[in-house]
Regions:
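ABC transporter nucleotide-binding domain
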Residues: 172-258
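Short, charged/small-residue-rich alpha-helical element at the C-terminal edge
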Residues: 224-298
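Generic structural signal for individual residues within well-ordered alpha-helical segments
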Residues: 94, 109, 116, 168, ...
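Hydrophobic aliphatic residues
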Residues: 62, 174, 222, 295-296
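ABC transporter nucleotide-binding domains
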Residues: 2-6, 11-205, 211
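Residues at or immediately preceding the N-termini of alpha-helices
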Residues: 68, 105, 215, 235, ...
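Short, charged, intrinsically disordered terminal tails
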Residues: 299-303
Length: 303
């Protein structure tokens, strides 16, 4: 079932077109990523989904209907701008957020205890928010979006500013939320996290959809074959080899992008035929970062 449907949505602020004719669908039990550089329209898109901003054009349906008050309690939202009631204790803060979303006091207290333990902050339950580190505060705000078991979770740059340990915790929790059937949509410019999580993604550039698909579809569209090698010899020879499209040097190693139909044995033979002594040779899958850089440069892959 489609939980979020955006069709041809656009939004301008004066002469600036922040979002242009953007369409996507998010199904239950999936994680959907909206990827783009800062200023590409990610936050504006999310605010339109939540009815904080009204689209100039297009249609947004949540659970198959336009946004209404009843839907608010079905959605969990982490905004890009972080903020907690700094003088409130963590327990009181989470219970308050839960009750705002329709939980009873007892339900909210039970959920608060569960989530605080889940993210490793049980000993901080009775501390004021201002006593927590920035990373701790961010985890509390994250779980405040989940405390009422929403069926739709929308997270705007959830990993921004987190250390690696806290990032792993959030990644794990997002997978857990997906497994219980929620639809999760998040925006990010941190590609390694998106690559681990998403079932489907949309790249946006200057407010426009430039690429949409599953991870497999996106990687298949950019079908160049990548090799990582270390050679004893002149690296400048690499760019002259058959089917080589691009060479990047990383110290004594090189990442070589070749045409999509290049077989590893074929490329290795070409290296040896050129008189190069190969010390390391491996085929690597194009990363989402590689694809992202191409998309942001305006390359669209195969048609």
């Amino acid at each position: 079932m489609e939980k979020i449907e955006a069709t041809g949505i656009s939004k301008s602020f004066g002469e600036v077109r922040a979002v242009r004719d953007l369409s996507f669908r998010v199904e239950e039990g999936t994680i959907y990523g909206i990827l783009g550089v800062n200023g590409s329209g990610k936050t504006t898109t999310i605010r339109m989904l939540l009815n904080i901003l009204t689209p100039d054009q297009g249609e947004i349906l949540i659970n198959g209907r336009p946004f209404d008050e009843e839907l608010k309690n079905r959605i969990g939202y982490l905004p890009e701008e972080r903020g907690l009631y700094r003088k409130m204790k963590v327990r009181d803060l989470l219970c308050y957020m839960g009750e705002l979303k329709g939980l009873t006091s007892a339900q909210a207290n039970k959920k608060a205890s569960y989530w605080v333990e889940r993210v490793g902050l049980s000993e901080w339950m009775d501390k004021k928010a201002e006593e927590l580190s920035k990373g701790m505060q961010q985890k509390i705000q994250f779980v405040s979006a989940l405390i009422h078991d929403p069926e739709i979770v929308i997270l705007d740059e959830p990993f921004s500013g987190l250390d690696p340990i806290n990032t792993v915790t959030l990644l794990e929790v997002m997978e857990e939320v997906k497994k219980r059937g929620a639809a999760v949509l998040f925006s990010t410019h941190i590609l390694e996290h998106a690559e681990k999580l998403v079932d489907k993604l949309t790249f946006i550039r200057q407010g426009q959809n430039v690429l949409t698909g599953t991870m497999g579809e996106v990687k298949g569209r950019f079908a160049a074959t990548l090799f990582r090698i270390r050679i004893d010899g002149e690296g400048s020879l690499l760019s002259s080899l058959p089917k080589v499209l691009k060479v990047q040097a990383f110290g004594h190693e090189y990442e070589v992008e070749t045409e999509g139909d290049t077989e590893p044995t074929e490329f290795l033979k070409n290296l040896l035929a050129a008189g190069l002594r190969v010390e390391k040779f491996e085929k690597v899958e194009p990363s989402l970062t590689n694809i992202y850089m191409k998309v942001m440069r305006g390359e669209d892959g195969k048609n």
